[in-house]
A protein has these predicted regions:
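Periplasmic polypeptide-binding modules associated with outer-membrane biogenesis and secretion
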Residues: 1-150, 154-156, 162, 176-187
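Residue-level signature of outer-membrane beta-barrel architecture
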Residues: 165-167
């Protein structure tokens, strides 16, 4: 009973051997290791998700990581590698994949992140090739705001214009400038 004394449970878990189909002979469960990690920085979520349909014009290698891009690499390679929470040779761990999603989600230069794993084609099915596919957000934005006020019968108006650049130095830094002007007519003076 867990409600008394130690508040602990003795639990034993028995995993049955893996079977691909019902009639197959049982085999041990595989431990998957990450083989190769690739970055694709100009992934379009509205197009086909097949890797062969992604348009790639250029690539570079940074610390053993191939980075594929279409026209111009909009993030420094160090930013991409530093936000990755797993490495080649690691055992597959879903927690590290979720941490990677969280880290890339914090970068304002990125709109979407998709991480896909494929078993290698060279006979060893316990190796996974990883593709980190990134979709950039709009890098520049301009906004205009109007505001009207009425406090104790005094009328006023304000306007502001703001400019935002999401990756000015290619590190997902956010640069923002805002200009605001206001006028209020004071009655009774």
């Amino acid at each position: 009973d867990t409600a008394r004394n130690t508040h602990q449970v003795d639990l034993t878990l028995h995993l049955l051997p893996y079977k691909t189909y019902v009639g197959d002979t049982p085999k041990e469960h595989f431990q998957y290791k990450i083989n190769k990690i690739n970055f694709i920085t100009d992934y379009d979520v509205l197009q086909s998700s097949a890797l062969s349909s992604i348009e790639i014009n250029d690539s570079l290698h940074y610390n053993g990581f191939p980075i594929y891009y279409k026209d111009k690499l909009y993030l420094r390679p160090k930013v991409l590698v530093d936000n990755l929470r797993f490495a080649s040779g690691d055992l597959y761990d879903e927690r590290n994949v979720q941490k990677t999603y969280t880290y890339f989600g914090r970068l304002s230069a990125l709109k979407y992140t998709n991480i896909r794993f494929f078993e290698t084609q060279n006979g060893d099915s316990t190796q996974l090739n990883c593709y980190v596919m990134l979709t950039k957000s709009k890098h520049k934005s301009i906004s205009f705001e109007l505001e009207g006020t009425n406090s104790a019968g005094d009328l006023g108006a304000a306007a502001s214009v703001s400019f935002q650049h999401r990756y000015l130095f290619r590190g997902s830094e956010t640069f923002m400038v805002k200009f605001r002007g206001a006028y209020e007519a004071i009655s009774g003076l």
